[in-house]
Structure formats: C-alpha cells, structure tokens
A protein has these predicted regions:
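Non-catalytic cell-wall polysaccharide-engagement segments
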Residues: 13-32, 41, 82-109, 113-206
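N-terminal hydrophobic alpha-helix used for membrane targeting or insertion
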Residues: 3, 46, 165-167
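Bacterial N-terminal signal peptides
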Residues: 2-12
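A Zn2+-metalloprotease active-site environment signal
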Residues: 38
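Extracytoplasmic
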Residues: 45-50, 55, 68-71, 127
Length: 206
C-alpha cells in the first residue's frame, strides 16, 4: 500500500497536460493568429507554438492586465509595445496592446526579431531561448549564455544547460523565466497541434 507521501509524489508527477484544455475564447482569435503568423513566418509558421504562448500569457483574454502592467492577449509591457510598433511601423502602426489583431501581429513579429538573434543546437532549444527572451529580455539571455559557456556548459543548448544558469535575476524572476519556455513548449504546445505545427514534439515525453 502506498504511503500518502509517495501517493502524493506520484500524483504530482502525472502529466499535467492531461487536464489542459483550449479556452473557449481562443477560437475567435484562431484565424487572426494563423493569418498573422503566415504573413510573418510563411506557411511553415509554428502555429501551435504561438497559440501556446498566448495561452500562457493571457489565457486568450484580450483585456488581460498583469499586476506589473503587461497588457492584452500578448501581455506587452507599455514600453515594449511602443518599441516594437516603432521598429515595424508599416506592419504594426500605432501600438494597441488591447486590440487582439494588433497584439497577435506584434507577438509573432517580436518572436521573429528574437528568433533571428538566437542560435541553438535544435529548433526546440532555439525557441526556448526566444521565449526566455520574450519573457525576460534578450539581454538576460545573452548574459546567461556567457555564464553557461564560462562554466563549461553548452551555450547553444537551452534545456538542461543554459536554463540552469542565472546571471543575476532575483530568485522569483529566475523561476518564472525558466518555467515560461517549459510551460509553452512542453505543456501547452501539444494541445494546439490541431491548429498547426509545433517545434518541440521530440521532447513531449521527456
């Protein structure tokens, strides 16, 4: 007979994705996300990855506000929304983080900007770097890579390598930032595969 402690541990280790569902609100934005992703990334855009990112950011609530001030479906901070709109005025125009169409265009555009600045040993690892940067800033990713390399770790691998190194974040920010790519790529991406491709299928069972 299992002790309560062991039973609790085994229960905690069960795949959390079994209870995950796509929110009802997501369907109304599906077509807009697909169109925006194809426009920026082409027909091979990882739709499931983008959808999982929105799921993690706002659970598809266009009016979402975080305690620290992030706004809309893609949870842009005001300064980041203004910056990305200024960087791509033709594609994005005036920043409108609470406008679902603008938020989804801005998310896939910012992800592309980050993707172009992050190399990795696999596509899954590359997206983990991208998502870490989306959550905490590219500067932190660069510093974490340098620290990992100086410590003898592979700076081109995120999982079980760079993700272990903290170049100076607070404990809370570090924990949030490390959970962010894993939740999106290893937990939520798979529930959106009916929408399109993901990038981390080889790691779903790890």
């Amino acid at each position: 007979m299992l002790t309560l402690g062991l039973l609790g541990l085994l229960t905690a280790c069960q795949p959390a994705f079994a209870t995950d569902r796509i929110p009802t609100a997501a369907e109304q934005y599906r077509r807009t996300l697909v169109r925006s992703a194809h426009a920026e990334w082409g027909l091979s855009a990882p739709i499931a990855t983008f959808a999982a990112q929105v799921h993690q950011e706002s659970r598809w609530r266009a009016d979402a506000r975080s305690p620290v001030g992030a706004q809309g479906l893609a949870q842009f901070m005001p300064g980041t929304a203004e910056w990305i709109a200024g960087l791509y005025p033709a594609a994005l125009g005036t920043n409108q983080p609470f406008n679902p169409g603008w938020a989804l265009r801005a998310l896939v555009t910012y992800d592309r900007w980050l993707y172009d600045r992050n190399q990795a040993s696999s596509e899954c690892d590359r997206w983990a770097f991208v998502l870490s940067a989306y959550n905490g800033g590219q500067g932190w990713v660069n510093r974490d890579r340098r620290l990992a390399s100086a410590s003898g770790a592979d700076q081109l691998a995120w999982f079980d390598s760079v993700e272990r190194f903290n170049a100076g974040r607070s404990a809370a920010n570090f924990r949030e930032n490390r959970n962010y790519p894993r939740l999106i790529l290893l937990r939520y991406e798979r529930i959106y595969l009916q929408w399109g491709d993901g990038v981390c299928g080889e790691r779903y069972t790890l």
